[in-house]
Amino acid sequence: YMPEKGLTYRSEVMSFLGAQLYERFRSPELRSLVDHFSRQKDAPPQVSAMVRRVESNYIYINKIPQAEYQAYIALIAKAEQVWEQAREANDFQRFAPYLERIVDTLRAFAGYWGYKAEPYDALMSFYEPGTTVQQMDRLADELKHFVIDLFQTLQARGMPCGEPAEGRFRLPLEEQRALSQYVLETIGFDFASGRLDEGPHPTTLAASPGDVRVITSYQAEDFRSGLFNTLHEGGMGLYEQDIDPALLGMLLGEVASFATELAEARLYENIIGRSAGFWEYLFPRMQQLCPSLAVDERETLFQSVNQVRPTLIRNNADELTYILHILIRYEVEKDLMV
């Protein structure tokens, strides 16, 4: 974590580095190199892909005024730390001014980049190239109706389990840490090329395939939250560790897209982590690692992680209603860009 007094200087350094990157991407030399290699019809596919990536970055950066680009880099560096403090204090107003400035900046960037139909198209194209708001609206509408209809059907049939008894899924943090370590080892995460840490919010950080940091978070009163956080981020970590090291230094040694990375995370979290086979495998070892576990039947745990019970917290959402959290965020982001 970043010590509070280190925040200001860190933001200044990131702004400086952003300026260096900006100047390099605006240089005539880079434009000349891109043009040269774009004409090489017999170039290896990795080189052609790298040239396309460099040209895309060149176009995006060159449309933004340098002062605004530097200010944005400094803003997001500071905003992340303020968000962490606001979250800890449960004080949204502390973070609100930073969020407002970020949204205003992205609106301006969308104007610089240009769009055909909606401002959010500019950001969609940046984060998921080739995707449009029109496509996403159609997909979101189909998903929304499917999820809500299925949820209502499940409600009518009655949930497979009632509300859990208070304290039933409580586990000491040390036992949860041991469980998360074991689960990552089980799915193939290479601890010689990564590590498991704790933070205020689950995430995965990767400097290279040989340095992948899975960051999880735990709830003492319900071990399932930490377990599925770890499976989710572990899926991302495996993706990062499987990137070909030969692509490093070519702007290609990173995830292909946010959607691809999240699909890997959801695969391990849900398709594997909520399967009967997974719990048949995990439960005996879990009983050894977690002597405080109050649940003595594998089937009870298996059913508990497959219940559908809406929650306001996305990280604690079940497999079905999690999708609604994503759809709501999509609609909010789209509206903010107008």
Question: What are the residue ranges of the model-derived segments?
Answer:
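Long, amphipathic alpha-helical stalk/connector segments used for oligomerization, subunit docking
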Residues: 274-338
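Glycine- and acidic
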Residues: 159-166, 212-220, 244-251, 312-317, ...
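Hydrophobic/aromatic-lined pockets within catalytic cores
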Residues: 128, 148, 152-155, 159, ...
